[in-house]
Amino acid sequence: MMQETLFALCDPTRREILKMLKKGSKTAGEIAERFDISPPAISRHLSILKDAELVETRREGKFVVYELICEPLDELDDWLRNMMKENL
């Protein structure tokens, strides 16, 4: 799963989306408003984040709401910290 996490994090737009979601859940429309890219591009970014299990979705009426999942980021952080300890 770490490979998917790293792939998702390599894009600055996806990192910015994660920063937004760190402050709280957002609808796809609220996320899209923040960026000057096409709706299909935003949808693709959100799909990659979901595939990497960095976000989860739920329906609220006609809206899809995205929420940050911190566990994959915590796992990556732990791995990086352990890697640094081993190399020092």
PLM-predicted stretches and their roles:
Residues 33, 44, 50-51:
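Alpha-helical residues within the helix-turn-helix
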Residues 50-60, 67:
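Beta-hairpin "wing" of winged helix-turn-helix
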Residues 20, 34:
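Residues within the alpha-helical elements of helix-turn-helix
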Residues 15-17:
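Pre-recognition alpha-helix immediately N-terminal to the DNA-recognition helix
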Residues 27, 38-41:
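Helix-turn-helix DNA-binding motif, specifically the short coil turn and the N-cap/start of the second
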Residues 1, 19, 69-88:
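Amphipathic alpha-helical dimerization/coiled-coil segments
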Residues 12, 23-27:
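Short capping segments at the starts of secondary-structure elements
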